[in-house]
Amino acid sequence: MTPGRRSSTFTRLLRHGFTDPSAAERLLDGAGLAELRADPVLLEALGATADPDLALHGLVRLLEAQPDATARQELLDTLIAAKPLRDRLLGVLGASEALADHLARHAGDWQTLVTYEPRDLHRGVEEFERGLAEATDPVTLRVAYRRCLLSIAARDVCGTIDVAETAAELADLAIATLRAALALAEAAAPEDAARCRLAVIAMGKCGGHELNYVSDVDVIFVGEAADTGPDADEAKAMRAATSLAAHMMRICSETTVEGSIWPVDANLRPEGRNGPLVRTLSSHVAYYQRWAKTWEFQALLKARPVAGDPGLGAEYVAALQPLVWQAADRENFVPDVQKMRRRVVENIPLTEVDRQLKLGPGGLRDVEFAVQLLQLVHGRADTSLHSGTTLDALEALAAGGYVGRTDAAQLDEAYRFLRSMEHRIQLHRLRRTHLVPEDEADLRRLGRSLGLRTDPVTGLLRAWKRHASVVRRLHEKLFYRPLLDAVAQLAPGEARLSPEAARERLVALGYADPAAALRHLEALASGVTRKAAIQRTLLPVLLGWFADSADPDTGLLNFRKVSDALGTTPWYLRLLRDEGAAAENLARVLSAGRLAPDLLMRAPEAVALLGDGVAGGLRPRDRAQLEQETLAAVRRADDAVQAVTAVRGVRRRELFRTAAADIVGSYGTETQPVEADQGALVDLVGGAVSDLTSATLAGTLRAVVREKWGDVLPTRFAIIGMGRFGGHELGYGSDADVLFVHEPRDGVAEREAGDAANKVVSEMRRLLQVPSADPPLLIDADLRPEGRSGPLVRTLKSYEAYYRRWSLGWESHALLRAEFVAGDEELGRRFIELIDPLRYPEGGLGEDAVREIRRLKARMESERLPRGADPKLHAKLGPGGLSDVEWTVQLLQLRHGHEIAGLRTTRTRTALAAARDAGLISEEHTATLDEAWVLATRVRNAVMLVRGRAGDTFPTDPRELAAVGRYLGHGSGHAGDMLDEYRRTARRARTVVEDLFYA
């Protein structure tokens, strides 16, 4: 061979897409192909394949496998003369290494491809049955199956059948194979076959007539006794049916010298793998009527009798199909289906999520779930939607106005492309996978197999991401956009949801008042303004987020109120349109209960906090920042009323910021997962609200002093936080427990100083409770010496004298939480120095005092628990609740605080950790108490967020209870699970309390 000849061939091979032209040249020199190397038709045909190198290698192997020279020449002659055969054979060899292996083992099977013309009719089950008829055992069945598969793959890769036809033929081939396998099983056990009637119901993609190249074939078995007379032995018949079904599954699933066909999976049957393999029809019906979960009815959408007794199969479908179309009436139907979809995504390994073609975001399952959801909601009233095939169902949904035509067309295109990718990925080695390969050679072959010849890798990845993006954008919006079309003006000829269909869909989404919801949608989406246009774009997504809450009606109503208040404000529309997190954060906040929306409605401009830009951010501000802002507001004001109004406005805004951060952290969003550390959320809320209360008191104090006395009050004045306030554990609705301490300035009479201090307190309390748009802050000084009977304000000397002579045990106990919060810092420091010996007594608390604390605790439990309340569900005073944990920790502080520095803190969780570190409590007991305290605190926070008023027990209203559950991480319909979890957690904590506190 001359160098020029070689160079010319090398160049031609390179031009035709060979990646290793040198190796290709060597192959063309042998195996009788030398005469073809100059044939431009053959090289062009090889170059048209997905992988020319692989196709040539497979062709050489096929030629070498021919039994003799005559057979080899026949193959070569056919390749030259018959273009359809040439394109199909080389197309398969270039796309599927596994089918090339099959052809190398069964060298005559290439002739299967000769009999088909370029324009193919769909091959039905019966034709595939004829193709499998020669199979007499599992091995020959596998060979016949691969031969039939070869014909499907050949026409698929050549484009003479599209992806939907390919999937349908693969399903028909699977059905023919199930029938052949069942026939083999019956032939092996004729007595069993005579004893029973057995029907095979195809499920999943086989039932839906849309199977992959390599997939489990999902089935359900139904059996009955063949003899229906009085002497029929049902138990014996069911054993026979089970034996036949199991044998049929083995024939398909077991690996032989010819490999396996595919696994037959019967786990969609009632009770899954724990249930009997075969049931009678009546047993199936009883299960679905009493026990089936929502997803099981969704699975029945695709149920189709395919093998065995046709009459029994038809009876099965007739009995169960009516139940399928009642599934949408089940409580929490849509949330349950959507939650299951989210769970699938969450279970994808992180290393695979970006390559998941089927299960990942924007994948095939998103389209299938969305379509099935709509079918189940509207299928009871519209039988045109009763299809198990995704693309057929999508077309029917569009025709009926249940889905916008443009959306349906985009989803159809995306689904076809993604399914084509899935088919070609699996076809290469006939392995079950839904992962897009990472190897560049694999990506190149995959791209070329889909017709992307110019830069196939880049083109493939770009097209895949584009279609996945379309699916991700549309799959949930698909459910909501037609609701807007139902209340909007549409172009002539465009189908729309009927009012009844719109009502059905809203009810399925969890809306209690669908008529009101439609009115809100009409008000929000109607018109030609920029506001209406942006809201029409946003609402389909917002409706989905509202539906994910426990109260979609309130979420939509609140959005309308905010929109009415801010809709003409340019920054508001820009925020929702452009700030990635703002719209979802707003939806979560508006539908999570009453508190946050109420705070927002009083000043809708706080929506700006929900953005993810520089001006946004939900992280609460620290005490120094808050105090600086409140004091600046006071300086700008003309009088105390105006000043405190401004301070309360800051408090309202920051309460909203904290509540929004808490809600977003508890619910999670598309961009921010649920906060895994629930203790961190509790600390965030407690710290933020406590810091905000300190800053509010500091600003109010400054305003009152400035109004009455100018810059200097006649007496030094300090506010000491007590209880949860001092412990940095305030909730949204907590009062501010405080002590007031003052000290006359030099030259000021004690009476004058006392009058001034009392006037300050009185005016602060009045101004912070004046009815206004802002929530009041109640100041509670009942923990002062002598309680309500004692003076409201004392001097430092008076406190010292009282504590030295009259202090009771409960007062030392209460002082554990005392911390300076506002006013004269130096005076506050001296007060803390005064009380330290009381709360951390030298030598620890005596036994008499310990017994007194225990008696007081027991009395409080019996006297303060509200009448009629369930103690086991009372988050504050119930067993294992806040009081139990806090008193246990505080007893450890009183006994050991003098010697363990870590216990000298006002914060419960910090003190608990210090007790653990000091060996006073085990790691296990610490975790138990901490978990109970965090959960009880979150319950109280949730109740306040949901109801807009404080409470220590779970709500009795079902919707409010569901909203509390949603905040605590329990989906719709799982309020019972939430209550059980609380009882278990509290019960474990109570056991520890009895061991540590009462022992």
Curated annotation (Swiss-Prot):
Top EC class for this record: transferase
The entry's keywords: ATP-binding, Magnesium, Multifunctional enzyme, Nucleotide-binding, Nucleotidyltransferase, Transferase
Keyword Transferase part of the UniProt annotation: yes
Location of the region described as Adenylyl transferase in the Swiss-Prot/TrEMBL record: 489-999
GO cellular component terms, semicolon-separated: cytosol
CDD domains, A to Z: NT_GlnE_GlnD_like
Protein name (database record): Bifunctional glutamine synthetase adenylyltransferase/adenylyl-removing enzyme
